Structures are given as C-alpha cells and as structure tokens.
Design a protein with these regions (language model features):
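Helix N-cap motif at beta-to-alpha junctions
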Residues: 50-55, 100-103, 151
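Short, charge-patterned binding micro-sites
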Residues: 17-49, 79
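Ordered, amphipathic secondary-structure segments that act as subunit-interaction surfaces
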Residues: 41-96
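Short, flexible, solvent-exposed loop/turn segments with mixed acidic/basic and small polar residues
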Residues: 34-38, 82-88, 134-140
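Core RNA-modification/binding signature centered on pseudouridine synthases
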Residues: 111-203
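Short amphipathic alpha-helices in soluble, non-transmembrane regions
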Residues: 57-66, 105-114, 161-162
Length: 203
C-alpha cells in the first residue's frame, strides 16, 4: 500500500515533503500494517506536505487517481504536537465473516477467567492470556465484530482470537476466512478515539 499511495501522490501532484540524503523518499507512514489477505475500510497514514489546498480539493485530486475499490475518505491537518499514527494506535475494530458460531458459544468463551493462546514470534513462542486484549466482541447477523488491542504496546490479531474461539467451541474454521479491518483508535484520557477524529479539515 505504501508504494501504491506514493504513486497516487505523485500522479495527483500533491506537494509531498521528501527526506534528504542519497535516496529521498516521501515522508509517509502508515498507522498499522495490514496483514496479507485482510480487507479494510479503516486505514490511516501520515503524510508530510510542503503546501496544500483545502481538504475538499485534495480529496478530489487524490481520488481521481485512485484505482477502483480504493477511496480516501478524509484529509486532515494534524496538530503541531501530534505524534505519528503508528506510535499512537491502541486498538482496532474487525469484522469476521462467518456463520459457524452462536451466542451461547460466544458467552461461554468470554466467561472464561482466562483465554490462553500460544503466541509465536520470530524468535520464540509463549503462552499469553489474550482476554484483557479483547475490548469488545459480539455476534452480528453476518459474522463477528471485535475490538482488540492493536499497536506497539499490545497487539492482538483477530485470527488469533478466532483460532482460540474455534478451538474452545470445537468448531473447524475453513481454510479461508474473510477478515475486515473497520477502524483504528488511539487513547485519549483512557478512552479509545478513532484516528479520524484527530485533527481537522482544511477549509
């Protein structure tokens, strides 16, 4: 996605700031990498620009260069003291499209004192209680909605939750399950706030 949007910024003639040095690159950073195969309608990236027009004009210019299925929904000016999106992400909403579970299964799963999973990293693997990292989870008509910890401090992938849920409920997940990231959040006064609520439109 980084390379894609770098090309879009060039084609839409956004006055992007570039790094200095031997190999200058656009000053762009995404809030949280999207796992391969995961859909999304809630991605965010920071972009440093030298100059800009109004949010309305910039959205029109950028979206005119976007491929079908990709749309930039907001273009906002961040406060001078704002940290980059990657460093402030604290949570994310996901939708898992499946009809294999019912409310009784979900209630029993979440009523456990702990939800222990084996979390693997490149260097090791260890048992982790992921229950505190599941902020909200509920059954919906077309699948399961969950809000989980996301970011540098704590990061819980939705497929890890679903693997634990399926094992608990003695359900076999199909090889391919559709996951969609809906939104991402930062913490403000111990409350999760959508990244889209940070900053303001440029008039």
């Amino acid at each position: 996605m980084v390379r894609y949007f770098q090309k879009v910024m060039r084609r839409s003639e956004v006055d992007v700031a570039y790094s200095e040095g031997f190999s200058p690159h656009q000053k762009m950073s995404f809030a949280s990498p999207l796992s391969v195969g995961v859909l999304s309608r809630g991605e965010y990236f920071d972009l440093e620009v030298n100059s800009t027009e109004s949010s309305k004009v910039m959205l029109e210019r950028i979206n005119a260069q976007n491929a079908e299925g990709v749309e930039v929904l907001s273009y906002k000016l961040l406060p001078d003291d704002a940290k980059n999106a990657m460093s402030v992400v604290a949570g994310a909403d996901y939708k898992v499209y499946t009809d294999l579970f019912n409310q009784n299964m979900l209630d029993a799963f979440m009523n456990q004192d702990q939800i222990i999973v084996l979390k693997k990293t490149k260097k090791s693997e260890k048992e982790v209680d992921i229950k505190p990292l599941i902020y909200n989870i509920k059954l919906e008509d077309d699948g399961i909605f969950m809000q989980v910890a996301q970011g540098s401090a704590s990061n819980l992938k939705p497929d890890l939750v679903m693997d634990a849920f399926a094992k608990f409920a003695q359900v076999t997940l199909p090889e391919y399950v559709t996951y969609e990231r809906i939104d991402m959040y930062c913490l403000e006064d111990d409350n999760l706030v959508s990244l889209d609520d940070i900053g303001g439109n440029i008039e």
